[in-house]
Amino acid sequence: MKRERSNILNLRMDELKEALAAINEPQWRAAQLHQWLFSHRAGSFDDMTTLSLPLRRKLAESFYIQQPVTEKHDETMEGSPAGATEKLLIQLPDGERVETVLIPGPNRMTACVSAQAGCLLGCSFCATGQMGFRRNLSSGEITGQVWALSDMLQERNREASISNIVFMGMGEPLLNTANVIEAVLNLSTRKYRFSTSQRKITISTVGITPEIDRLADTGLKTKLAVSLHSAIQEKREALMPQAARQYPLDRLRESLIGYASKTGEPVTLAYMLLKGINDSEMDAKRLIRYASGFFCKINLIDYNPIVNIKFEPVCDGTRERFRDILQDAGLQVTIRKSYGTPINAACGQLAADCTGNSDNL
């Protein structure tokens, strides 16, 4: 019985080698094939002129090439002095949807990509968690989001190109570690289309400690950001019940110390300030205790409004007082500006238009 063809873009490098072996081709050809797919972005096997015609025919018998499709585009100039923040709703070949965001900044252009369709963690302040979990994205589907944003730039004849990549879109990257790592390699390999420095790639996580440990041992030089939001275990459990209970703060801190030590990169602790929840002087002092003694920096983030979620952002004075307490203790602190709020493209707002109307999310 003839096997049904599948999308070759969903295969990692190790899987490409296995696929070639299955059709009696040498595994070393996987590097050529991989470059055609993820650097040259070949649209068909006929485009792969450095591969023999018999090999191209065999590949076409077992596989097809299908890129994700951009279904919707939104943009806003609000809050961004460097240009429009833009969001793409992307439909994957099986009909699932994800969102990806282009964020302009001084001397940089950042692609914010999703690692999963939906999310199973259900953090209380996040729109993606309201969707539930659909599935992990393949490394090709993650890479394809950067391609889609890059295509958008080129179509408008912008001189700017994507310089930074952050895994801060939909889903938990470290519950899809193998495909995230493969996507990082796709996007950072020298002489490939993007060749992005790994030090300009940030992987964000709620704190999946075994995967943080695994990431630290890969030799990758990516940066790590952790959604902390409270240094008090009980409060963190209320905000992020699944992640906080399964990966307690003490165990998380051990992993963060190990990551910073092995990579030489500071860990970013993301802290979303929520009015009356985690914004007190006591909260700041507990954060000081938690963050002291290892290589880290703190990003304070404003809460972005989400329908059916009742948190409130803090006022400017509260945010600045909280920052000052941390800085007076010697911590490196940045107040992170949120871009894309009017189009539901800011931190915590991505939900893949799951109601059919992104304006309602």
Swiss-Prot record:
S-adenosyl-L-methionine binds at residues 171-172, 204, 227-229, 304. The active site is at residues 99, 347. The keyword S-adenosyl-L-methionine applies. One of its GO terms (molecular function) is rRNA binding. [4Fe-4S] cluster binds at residues 119, 123, 126. Keywords: 4Fe-4S, Cytoplasm, Disulfide bond, Iron, Iron-sulfur, Metal-binding, Methyltransferase, rRNA processing, S-adenosyl-L-methionine, Transferase, tRNA processing. PROSITE patterns: RADICAL_SAM. Disulfide bonds join 112-347. It comes from the Bacteria. It is found in: Cytoplasm. It holds the Pfam family RlmN_N. CDD domains: Radical_SAM (cd01335). Its cofactor is [4Fe-4S] cluster. Binds 1 [4Fe-4S] cluster. The cluster is coordinated with 3 cysteines and an exchangeable S-adenosyl-L-methionine. Reaction proceeds by a ping-pong mechanism involving intermediate methylation of a conserved cysteine residue. Belongs to the radical SAM superfamily. RlmN family. Specifically methylates position 2 of adenine 2503 in 23S rRNA and position 2 of adenine 37 in tRNAs. This is Probable dual-specificity RNA methyltransferase RlmN. It comes from Chlorobium luteolum (strain DSM 273 / BCRC 81028 / 2530).
